Regions:
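Metal-dependent polysaccharide deacetylase catalytic core of the NodB/CE4 family, i.e.
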Residues: 139-141, 151-158, 162-292
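N-terminal pre-catalytic segment of deacetylase/amide-hydrolase enzymes
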Residues: 20-144, 150-156, 163, 307-310, ...
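C-terminal motif of bacterial Sec signal peptides marking the signal peptidase cleavage site
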Residues: 15-19
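Repetitive helical segments and hydrophobic/amphipathic motifs
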Residues: 11-12
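Alpha-helical and His/Cys-centered functional microenvironments
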Residues: 57, 201, 298
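Catalytic grooves of carbohydrate-active enzymes
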Residues: 285-322
Length: 326
């Protein structure tokens, strides 16, 4: 009897190993390039991290009680602006339909038609918005970063930009300014743009025109008071907007900055290495590109220097958004 039981157990174990091997053989590894051409912040993990930081956000010790009339940057506080909401009830009937920004994958140093058409839509509608510089006849690119929350790589990115003498724009939330004021000070004092990415990172198209203004004003009030700084550049959270939202943002004096080059870099649990980041950006680079990278990505931080060097070897010049002429 014992012998029979032993034989049955042996057969069961063998079958289980066979089953494991069969399951493994069905596993496929997707090695294709990321092909998502829409908003790069749709991933829930990125949004959850921003929400998590917001819930526990406290002002860093660096940002408390300077004991002087100066702000953290050493600049004087700026006077706060009273924004006026034109057409608060949208009686002009501008579309409130949600648009998830799409850009397409550029190839052979040529922008994707999706980006070209997006820029045309902005221009035809007289919206103050940029996704692609189609005016310059030179090989220029604009480097921008979204900083929804801090993951420890912003300082490394700033070090590389300083070493390479490259200007950039950083789009931050109020919570990011509170939790990492040292980096904000560096951005400002080292000549970069700190753009308005709202107070709470909402889908702006889902808000009223007055609520949209309040999100923008809360950011502007905070950076004016604590850093003595303001800039006329705005980025829609999650890349979600509407014509009504574009109009409201422009009426407040801001240019909405989108992008024509990006990739799925925001998932900190799915980083693919610096070489992948470098190759992906360089394979999609094109004249007039507005490049979006996420500062939370270790791949971006490690690849940035090589990306800059290779782009320059290809004849590209990195310019500030301030150099863009609509």
């Amino acid at each position: 009897m014992k012998k029979i039981i032993s034989i049955i157990l042996f057969i069961s174990i063998c079958l289980s190993f066979t089953g494991c091997r069969n399951n493994d053989s069905n596993v496929s590894y997707n090695t294709d390039d990321e092909t998502d051409v829409r908003t790069t912040e749709a991933d829930t993990s990125y949004e959850e991290k921003i929400t998590e930081q917001s819930a526990k956000s406290e002002i860093s010790e660096f940002g408390k009680n300077t004991g002087t009339d100066k702000t953290l940057t050493g600049l004087e506080p700026l006077e706060l602006i009273d924004f006026t909401v034109n057409d608060p009830e949208n009686k002009n009937g501008l579309s409130t339909e949600k648009i998830a920004h799409a850009y397409g994958v550029a190839k052979d140093e040529t922008p994707n038609d999706i980006s070209v058409n997006s820029q045309k839509h902005f221009e035809d509608g007289n919206f103050r918005a940029l996704t692609l510089d189609n005016k310059s006849e030179e090989k220029v690119v604009y480097l921008t970063f979204d900083v929804g929350y801090d993951n420890g790589y912003t300082g490394m990115i700033l070090d590389t930009l300083k070493e390479k003498n490259v200007p950039a724009a950083f789009f931050c939330t109020v919570d990011e300014m509170k939790s990492d004021p040292e980096s904000i000070v560096r951005m400002i004092n080292e000549g970069h743009i700190v753009g308005n990415h709202t107070e709470n990172h909402p889908s702006m198209d889902e808000l009223s025109r007055t609520e949209m203004m309040q999100e923008i004003k809360a950011f502007d009030d905070y950076i004016r008071t604590n850093f003595g700084y303001s800039s006329p550049y705005f980025r829609f959270p999650k890349g979600e907007y509407s014509d009504c939202a574009l109009d409201l943002v422009g009426s407040l004096g801001y240019t909405s900055v989108f992008w024509s080059l990006a990739y799925a870099d925001w998932d900190i649990n799915n980083q693919k290495g610096a070489q992948y980041a470098h190759n992906t950006v360089i394979s999609r680079i094109h004249p007039g590109a507005v490049i979006l990278l996420h500062a939370v990505s270790s791949d971006n931080a490690n690849a940035l220097g090589d990306i800059i060097d290779t782009a320059r070897d290809m004849g590209y010049e990195f310019r500030s958004l301030e150099d863009y002429k609509a």
